[in-house]
Amino acid sequence: MRGPRRFRLWTRANVLTVISILTSILSGAGCSPLSQLPSDNPAHVGVQDGVTTERVDRSKNHRNTTASSGAHRVTSGEPLGDRVTTRSTTAPDQVPGDASRNTTMAGTKCSLQVDLSTFACPADCQCNATSEGMVVSCVTPDTLREFPVIAREVARAVIKLELRGQSKLTSLKTELKFFTCLKHLTIENCGLNNIQGIAFKTLTSLETINLRHNHLTEFPQELLRTLNLRELWLEGNALTCSCTNLWLRSVDVAADRSEMTCSTRDGVSKMKMTQFKCEPCGIPDIRNMTLVFEPKNGMFLLRFVISGCPKPKIDLLRNHHHVLRSGSSQFKLTDFKSEFNGQVVTGTITILPHMETSQTTYVLTAVNSKGQANQTFHLYDQTTPASSIHIPLSNIPPRISSATTPRASPTEDFGPQTQVILPVVGVVILLISAVFIIYLCQRAKHRSHARQRCKKALLDKKFNEFQEGVPLTGLQLVDNPNYNLTKKKHVATTCPKTVRLQTILLMRVIGEGAFGRVFLGTCAHLIQKNEFAIVAVKTLKGSCSDSLKRDFEREAEMLATIEHANIVTFYGVCTESDQWMMIFEFMENGDLNKYLRMHGPDAAFLKDRDSMDSDEGQLTREQLMKIVLQIASAMEYLALQHFVHRDLATRNCLVGCDLVVKLGDFGMSRDVYTTDYYRVEGTAMLPVRWMPPESIIYRTFTTESDVWSFGVTLWEVFTYGKQPWFEYSNSEVIEHIKNSRTLKRPPRTCTDGVYRVMQGCWKPNPQDRLTMKDIAELLREEVSGDPVYIDIIA
């Protein structure tokens, strides 16, 4: 604890230093906090290089039109949710309201005088003519199913329109486009829940909008872009805490602003609008994108963080073709999450490389109603980088906005104070990053010491001399671990159990591999005190390389985390001599392949007189199903633990008494079953007859490749141990597998259901294959529904 405590004290001192530096920089630059920036102009929140900034919208479109939404003020004494008063932003020499009205009314003819004798008022509505224009009022409850239809020439004369108590009126689209002289609009206590973006586009004379007590959840600022509005009433609507509504809190009276509330997305709770934080608003922004290649499954993982409001839609283009929308199994979107009320989306796109050698262009796109963002990258489909490929944020091109939402130039987006603040924030981020990196280094060093202590307790003891009478042969093959430990969310908290050397007695050699030999032996006090247990002892040559020793350590640590009824029990390790040992459960009937052959239709030609009792006959279908169910159960467990076996076959399964079958490979099968392995293009010996196309081509092993191997193992069991593709050479087998050919159905004992499981394991696309969980369930159903056959011919 001395080291971590000293580091914490050092970190506190550095944090104080960072704060003092930041204070001096801020005071020297004369900066004010972001909250004190001028708010006279409409603003939206944007994200640039991961730093949230408030951008003042000064685009040319907004300067040249007086129909700006302006800065929003709450009249003193009125609740903010009740009335929002807006004032237009005009040039200094203009009178607010007059000049803008002249501009917006240019080219618009208002027919203020209407001949009522030729005008038919809409049913259930009242129409009155005044000196200023027509007033239309529809207040009889639930009499309108749609917006009242008024002739175009009459609509131009309407200055006031009232709709109240119309619960069936749910949307507002383009029904108001001819009401060009409308000044006061009231839609109150209706069922209105949706307003289209162009609903108010032509209402350039509109002064007040009353939308009280409707069902609106969002009211975008874009609805008022073409208006010179003075009052907006939104009381009684269930406005959500979203970026779309964030502009409503941009008011000048802080006391009234604090009273405005919004509902969360679930509608259960409410919060003050001033407390709601919506970091990213506006056009989609690809804030971060990382491309990672995973050798274990031969796939690229494209991880992204994208912001935008409304929530952007994600797609991936490959050579200008949409691959996510098309539903292609070679491209899948996983881990898709949304944060900040749906305004930040994260996810991973899985890319399975194609059999191509030319460069392929990919484009990640994010689209919403405000615009689109693209990021392009290139891949050679046969490229297999050794480490992650990071695409830095600085390489991401500018956003591409839509035509309806123009972007200002960088000089127009940022005020002088913001330009000063950004470098300051950058300096702060650099300092914090430095402190964080130092903390990670110290933490990694602490973990390394802890691991070394564990290894020292396990492997670095001083030992007595131990000599075994049987010499070990030279290293013949480079042996790969038959189980592959993938990255897991948890780390084993205990070291493998240590077995004392004096409790082990080696009896005879039962196998040999590249690492050394496997002995039949006994071990005292292993399972119970004062009792001997028969065990299998896997030894490591004393003169082996450091890499084999590291593999031995990793395998021991991995095996210590596995515990299943159909996996050979790992008891522990012994490192008290030059010959390191692993102690396993002993399975008296040997490997499953030999057992199947000795209990199959050709057993009479294979067995020796003394090797087996004469009364043991051929295995029945029920016994074969019992065998495959046990293998499936073990593989289902490994898949759930994220372990990849990589060499599943009957030769690597062991048989005990009462037909108990367990997974257990001591690495000796490559010497015993030499014809099952083939050296491909100078690589290590590979079991190509059990491997799927992606493993042969890309040398990648995944849980899906284990599923393929299980299908071949299933075929082995129901053919009583025959070698897959026994009629072809290894090179011919590779061509058959690449061309999507599969093994023929085994005769007699294999049911239709079992063969369908085999076919489900041999799908060319890994994502289309059955999972081990599905396989286990299908086989259990096959057993429960399998009729019992009686041999009446014999």
From Swiss-Prot:
Active-site residue numbers: D647
Signal peptide residues on this chain, from the entry's feature table: 1-33
UniProt GO BP: cell differentiation; cell surface receptor protein tyrosine kinase signaling pathway; cellular response to nerve growth factor stimulus; nervous system development; positive regulation of neuron projection development; positive regulation of phosphatidylinositol 3-kinase/protein kinase B signal transduction
Cellular component aspect of the GO annotation: axon; plasma membrane; receptor complex
UniProt keyword annotation of Electron transport present: no
Membrane topology: Single-pass type I membrane protein
Domain Protein kinase: 504-775
Region (Disordered): 36-102
Residues with Phosphotyrosine modification: Y673, Y677, Y678, Y789
This enzyme's EC code(s): 2.7.10.1
Carbohydrate-modified residues: N64, N102, N128, N288, N374
Chain ranges on the Cytoplasmic side, renumbered to this chain: 441-794
Subcellular location: Membrane
Tissue expression as described in the entry: Expression is confined to the central nervous system and its associated endocrine tissues.
Domain LRRCT span(s) in chain numbering: 237-280
Catalytic activity: L-tyrosyl-[protein] + ATP = O-phospho-L-tyrosyl-[protein] + ADP + H(+)
Residue ranges of the TM segments: 420-440
Stored InterPro entries: Ig-like_fold, Kinase-like_dom_sf, Leu-rich_rpt, LRR_dom_sf, Prot_kinase_dom, Protein_kinase_ATP_BS, RTK, Ser-Thr/Tyr_kinase_cat_dom
Main location as per UniProt: membrane
Keywords tagged on the record: ATP-binding, Developmental protein, Differentiation, Glycoprotein, Kinase, Leucine-rich repeat, Membrane, Neurogenesis, Nucleotide-binding, Phosphoprotein, Receptor, Repeat, Signal, Transferase, Transmembrane, Transmembrane helix, Tyrosine-protein kinase
SMART domains: TyrKc
Topological domain spans for side Extracellular: 34-419
LRR repeat extents: 181-202, 205-226
Function: May bind an endogenous invertebrate neurotrophin. Binds human NT-3, but not NGF or BDNF.
Assigned protein family: Belongs to the protein kinase superfamily. Tyr protein kinase family. Insulin receptor subfamily.
Protein name: Putative neurotrophin receptor LTRK 1
